[in-house]
Amino acid sequence: MKFSHNWLNEYLGDTQDSQNLADTLTLAGLEVDAIEPVVAEKVSGVVVGQIKTINKHPDADKLNVCSVDAGEDELLTIVCGASNIYEGMKAPVAKIGAVLPGNFKIKKSKLRGQESFGMMCSEEELGLAEKADGLMDLPIDAPVGTDINKYLNLDDNIIEVDLTPNRADCLSVYGIAREVSALTKTELKNLEIPEPKVVIDDTKEVNITATDACHAYYGCIIKNVNNKIQTPLWMVEKLRRSGIGSISFFVDVTNYVMLLTGQPMHAFDLDKLEGRINVRYAKNNEELTLLDQTQVKLDCDTLIIADDKKALAIAGVMGGLDSSITDSTTNIFLESAFFVPEKIAGKARKYNLHTDSSHRFERGVDPQLAKKAMKIAIRLINEIAGGEVAPIHGAEDLANLNKQIKINLSIKKLNHVLGTNFDIEYVTEVLKALHMDVATSFDGNCIEVIPPSYRFDLEIPEDLIEEVARIYGYSKLPETMPKYAAAKTNISETYQSLDTLNMRLIDRGYHETINYSFIDPKFDEFFFADRGIAIQNPISQDLSIMRQSLIPGLINTFKANTSRQQNRVRIFEKGACFKLQDNQRIQFDRIAGLAYGELLNINWSNSKKVDFFDVKADVEALCNDLTSLSFEVCNDINWLHLGQSAYILANGNKIGVIGVIHPTVLKNFQIKAKAPIVFELDLDVLIKRQIPNFTKISKYPSVSRDISFLVDKSVLAGDIIKAIKALNINILKDVSIFDIYESQDSDRKSIALNMLFQDNLQTLDDKVIVESIDKVLEALKTKFNIEQRV
């Protein structure tokens, strides 16, 4: 929102300089982005002048010799080449000694032998415009000899405020003035709402069928207006200083009223309208040519203004070309309305548009402003362009327009939140300065507040507390240490914190990553048989499917790292995954990791590449609280390498997978590095910590025995361990494999086991140990056909 400081002062008086004003607004939450002078460089020695006579230059066809009244005793002779001059014209005159932008000093000069005692100026030469085709044509009532700085109010600054979406009430000069009045305790001048001088009875019937989207629509017919009238200079300048160029008189008036009040308006050519005015939703694919000459096909959820034959405008966004005002328009239909913000939001973006009107209607316009703004516009048109004014006519839903929100605010709560000691009188004074209705409750500690119609962002007590803090000044609030009431928190011993899981992987050299929850459809298709959940409005096409696993994201991160010369990668991620199950969207949490490259960072000792068993050890460390972790061969996951992958089980239930990424994955996704090892686990299982049972430590010595045997290569070492543990030998405390040897010349392999025996009641003798070992060997011979080595 840009505005002229001088224009603001018309409603406040000369309050403070622009920098102080900017500081006041910024500290109150209305951030000022920029302060710029109206002219970048000051002008001096320039006055209002009037051309008395014009004669052709004797030696130059394109030059004229003018006699100019600059308010001095004698007329000035000035040579001028502008094409738009005429006798009686008033224009800025730079006298000898004047200084223009660029430190351009005016001196007495000769042009083709003709002396010139000054220069008549265009907007460009005064620094008011980047380009101008001729002299600046001043109004005929401009006082000759008046300093141009004073006449054009050039001692002014343009202030630009970056408003948050909830402060649509400040998208107008008067809205900013209201705010400054409350902040500085300056008297706010009333906005004059003149009653139109009605002289004809013509009206247009208004029919609102989209009552959920439009709560008020007013129209006014003005006939026989002067279509040759030029926009007054004062209005052109106010528009320019607000960042809006002059287009035509009627458009300029609606823009001026919008900047002043915040109410967007539109003017139609009355003679191009057929029948009633209808506020309705568009028919699907209904066509409309807009003012910028683009043709759009409308969707059925787009609110439009139409007559009985055709669409006229996209409501709250932009008018149509076919009903627009032209140079030949003499009869106009002026529109002012209140549209529900939610029904306008997003419509401009849908049709690749952004207008000042849509910017305001999307954020919300004062529902009680439409008719007031129309009265201001009617008076301006009538006074400047003449015409015969008809009554304002329309349709309105007063119940919605006059809807009020009542908020109960506790002064005790306000002081508790802000750390202040405000009394009820001060809080009431602040809220009344913001034009709120305030009533005190019977106990004197609570007030009932009704916000003004334009402050629809105020709904709950906390909103009012913020308003009091803003007006009082955030910088003046007392600094107090936050109060913390310590309360005993019962944390279950069966819960494992996510931070603990994080640290277990970080301690083993992993780095946490965070990827999008969306993946490329080609990843989804390759990794999963069932298609994932599609996103209706994706960021991009390659992020349009909700992830069913964390692995695709880790592989993408792995690719990005290895393509940038990272030869050792350890990454993990935890997060939500999503899938369709029985036509229901299911969300579940996972933790996954990826390892690649050297086992250790570069050092003086010989290193080795990370392998399956290294990552298996990482998984075992991560699952330290699971008392019955095991692994089972996995042959049915297409993106893991056959023979180098396994399911991870807890208490016999599958909770995850581990394995080497299949080479086809690397090929399909153009990854040049060798295959990494990955794992993924059900996070819900890991955070449910298993509490170990107490086991008494034996005071008797343990006995260790080794056995070695041959077994078929197809037999898994893990199955042998399971078979031994299934015998439930009480004195067998632990069994582990310490050597495996395989020969190319044999279909059998050698496995060496270590068994640890201990009794809680007595010292073991060899006979008991031998019996236990024999029991183990007999079971293994029966199940796996082992052959003991001696």
From Swiss-Prot:
Binds 2 magnesium ions per tetramer. Tetramer of two alpha and two beta subunits. Its cofactor is Mg(2+). It catalyses: tRNA(Phe) + L-phenylalanine + ATP = L-phenylalanyl-tRNA(Phe) + AMP + diphosphate + H(+). This is Phenylalanine--tRNA ligase beta subunit. One of its GO terms (biological process) is phenylalanyl-tRNA aminoacylation. Belongs to the phenylalanyl-tRNA synthetase beta subunit family. Type 1 subfamily. It is found in: Cytoplasm. The keyword NADP does not apply. Residues 698-789 form the FDX-ACB domain. It comes from the Bacteria. GO terms for molecular function: ATP binding; magnesium ion binding; phenylalanine-tRNA ligase activity; tRNA binding. One of its GO terms (cellular component) is phenylalanine-tRNA ligase complex. Its EC number is 6.1.1.20. Transmembrane segments: none annotated. Residues 402-479 form the B5 domain. Keywords: Aminoacyl-tRNA synthetase, ATP-binding, Cytoplasm, Ligase, Magnesium, Metal-binding, Nucleotide-binding, Protein biosynthesis, RNA-binding, tRNA-binding. It comes from Francisella tularensis subsp. tularensis (strain SCHU S4 / Schu 4). The keyword RNA-binding applies. The lineage of its organism: Bacteria, Pseudomonadati, Pseudomonadota, Gammaproteobacteria, Thiotrichales.
